[in-house]
């Protein structure tokens, strides 16, 4: 019987469940995502403000250039009224003509007149810009931060919208100005009031289908399960009076670890746009990760409209600019996300690769790998890595992918035991280079073991009468050079017969061979399972000549048996 779980003793009485949304006819659970939403990167503002050391201007510029190169068309570049650094950065982008014609910069401002004037001033001379106005509307902040009722907070938003319009008309002649409003802490705001304040702001800006307003509904703090956020988004989408004049935008944070799910369900619920940061940077636990969202679409055969084909290059730039590492397990971009250590996983991946190679299909179907690592610029070298948890599949995959040695199944099992002993003794991971060292030390496929009881020095094969082969082999046997001869059904049988006459009983149980590459100078690999006395084991030989490779495999097996006796 399983022991019942025990109460934690943690102070759960301090907290209460988040209320559900009354939406019995919700439609989002039956929706599917068929195209990418509009993306807006907020790395340069929301992400930057959350850094221990905010970006220098040069780092901000490098990240801006990356975002443009990746294909982002809406980029929040700063809070110009918050710092001279942000103001100067916006001015540099405009004055140095660094904003591509198809990119719209976004700037953030609170609903205070002096901040709005400063923000609008930063945009003078720009071709197009999106001014993002926000004020907090949640019940908690109305009560403990502002001490205002609904009407008082609505007045802040409406007056802010008016100041935005007035200063834009005064200072931004010739600029294509678009508007965005965020009821900050939307998820902590009553839905009817969130709708009320958004409608009041729209009354000021008078959006049309040709000139829509962006209504951004942030989970400033993630407070519920993602399905509740989706219900909130669907409710808002249904009840907005000018829905055709609205770009409904999401801004999920990751406090509960569900930002990606919240964004995806929010899009299913009717949202048109998503704001986030590369690799989930941002306040506290971060904003939603734009890389994960984009790659999730890609993995479903949907164009993310963002270029992530060099995900390591993107990661390096983000790590440099943010001065924060990306976790090795971060979806799609972490160092270890395409890596398998588990033996059963490695075996399945190996067989998946082999099946795709055999059938020539283009549809990606490899167990444990949701996408082809090569599609994001990764190689297959790190897909399978060997440690104490690995089995024959991983070992065999690396031997084939790195060294072109296609080990027979029973040899895979035998060699994985050799590797397992090494990892048990030494611990840690075994690299491909170390794996080759273990293999050559154990099997000596090309000879060269000074302590070997049997060493191949040279050989000559001739076809005798009755289709039998005769071999003359120069060997060093127990330290003495000698020539042995034998005949049999092929060179291997003849060599085994010669050894038996010298008191080395060898019986061949299985034999495999293949070329290592192509062309006239290609080498051959031979694998021999033999019984030497009562010991059954494998030998491996490698040589440009297939006969010599086979004889080396016999020698390899005999020497291994001698070491084990």
Swiss-Prot record:
Which terms does the UniProt entry file under GO BP?
L-leucine biosynthetic process
| Region feature (Regulatory domain) | 446-565
What subcellular compartments does it reside in? Cytoplasm
Is Magnesium tagged as a keyword? yes
Cite the entry's keywords alphabetically: Amino-acid biosynthesis, Branched-chain amino acid biosynthesis, Cytoplasm, Leucine biosynthesis, Magnesium, Metal-binding, Transferase
Q: Which cofactor does it need?
A: Mg(2+)
Q: Does the keyword field hold S-adenosyl-L-methionine?
A: no
Which residues does the record give as Mg(2+) binding sites?
46, 251, 253, 287
Looking up Pfam families in the UniProt record yields: HMGL-like, IPMS_D2, LeuA_dimer
Entry's EC annotation? 2.3.3.13
Q: Which reaction does it catalyse?
A: 3-methyl-2-oxobutanoate + acetyl-CoA + H2O = (2S)-2-isopropylmalate + CoA + H(+)
CDD domains named among the record's database cross-references: DRE_TIM_LeuA
Q: Which family does it belong to?
A: Belongs to the alpha-IPM synthase/homocitrate synthase family. LeuA type 2 subfamily.
Q: Which NCBIfam families match?
A: leuA_yeast, PRK03739.1
**Descriptive protein name:** 2-isopropylmalate synthase
Source species of the chain:
Parafrankia sp. (strain EAN1pec)
Question: Coding gene?
Answer: leuA
């Amino acid at each position: 019987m399983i022991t019942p779980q025990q109460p934690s003793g943690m102070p759960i009485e301090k907290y209460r469940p988040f209320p559900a949304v009354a939406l019995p006819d919700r439609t989002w659970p039956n929706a599917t995502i068929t195209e990418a939403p509009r993306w807006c990167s907020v790395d340069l503002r929301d992400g930057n403000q959350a850094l221990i050391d905010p970006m220098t201007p040069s780092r901000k510029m490098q990240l801006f250039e990356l975002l443009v190169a990746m294909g982002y068309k809406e980029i929040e570049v700063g809070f110009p009224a918050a710092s001279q650094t942000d103001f100067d950065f916006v001015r540099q982008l405009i004055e140095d003509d660094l904003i591509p014609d198809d990119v719209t910069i976004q700037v953030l401002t609170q609903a205070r007149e002096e901040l709005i004037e400063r923000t609008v001033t930063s945009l003078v001379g720009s071709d197009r810009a999106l001014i993002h106005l926000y004020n907090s509307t949640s019940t908690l902040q109305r009560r403990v931060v502002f001490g205002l009722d609904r009407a008082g907070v609505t007045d802040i938003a409406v007056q802010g919208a008016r100041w935005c319009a007035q200063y834009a008309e005064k200072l931004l002649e010739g600029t294509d100005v678009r508007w965005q409003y965020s009821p900050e802490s939307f998820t902590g705001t009553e839905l009817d009031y969130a709708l009320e304040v958004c409608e009041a702001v729209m009354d000021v800006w008078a959006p049309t289908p040709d000139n829509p307003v962006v209504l951004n509904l942030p989970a400033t703090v993630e407070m519920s399960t993602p399905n509740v956020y989706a219900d909130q988004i669907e409710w808002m989408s249904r009840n907005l009076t000018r829905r055709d004049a609205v770009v409904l935008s999401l801004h999920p944070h990751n406090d509960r670890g569900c930002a990606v799910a919240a964004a995806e369900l929010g899009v299913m619920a009717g949202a048109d746009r998503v704001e986030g940061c590369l690799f989930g940077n941002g306040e506290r636990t971060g904003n939603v990760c734009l890389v994960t969202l984009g790659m999730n679409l890609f993995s479903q055969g949907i164009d993310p409209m963002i270029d992530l084909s060099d995900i390591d290059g993107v990661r390096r730039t983000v790590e440099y600019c943010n001065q924060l590492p990306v976790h090795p397990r971060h979806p799609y971009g972490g160092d270890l996300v395409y890596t398998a250590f588990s033996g059963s996983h490695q075996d399945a991946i190996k067989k998946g690769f082999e099946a795709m190679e055999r059938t020539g299909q283009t549809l990606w179907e490899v167990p444990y790998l949701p996408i082809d690592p090569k599609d994001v610029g990764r190689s297959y070298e790190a897909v399978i890595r060997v440690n104490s948890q690995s089995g024959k599949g991983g070992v065999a995959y690396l031997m084939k992918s790195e060294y072109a040695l296609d080990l027979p199944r029973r040899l895979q099992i035998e060699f994985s035991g050799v590797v397992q002993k090494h990892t048990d003794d030494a611990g840690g991971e075994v690299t491909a280079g170390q794996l080759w060292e273990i293999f050559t030390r154990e099997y000596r496929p090309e000879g060269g073991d000074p302590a070997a009881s049997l060493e191949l020095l040279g050989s000559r094969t001739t076809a005798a009468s009755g289709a039998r082969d005769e071999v003359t082999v120069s060997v060093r046997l127990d330290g003495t050079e000698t020539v042995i001869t034998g005949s049999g059904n092929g060179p291997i049988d003849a060599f085994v017969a010669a050894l038996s006459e010298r008191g080395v009983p060898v019986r061949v149980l299985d034999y495999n061979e293949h070329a290592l590459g192509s062309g006239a100078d290609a080498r051959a690999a031979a694998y021999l399972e033999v019984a030497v006395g009562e010991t059954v084991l494998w030998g491996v030989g490698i040589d440009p000549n297939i006969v010599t490779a086979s004889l080396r495999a016999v020698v390899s097996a005999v020497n291994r048996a001698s070491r084990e006796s």
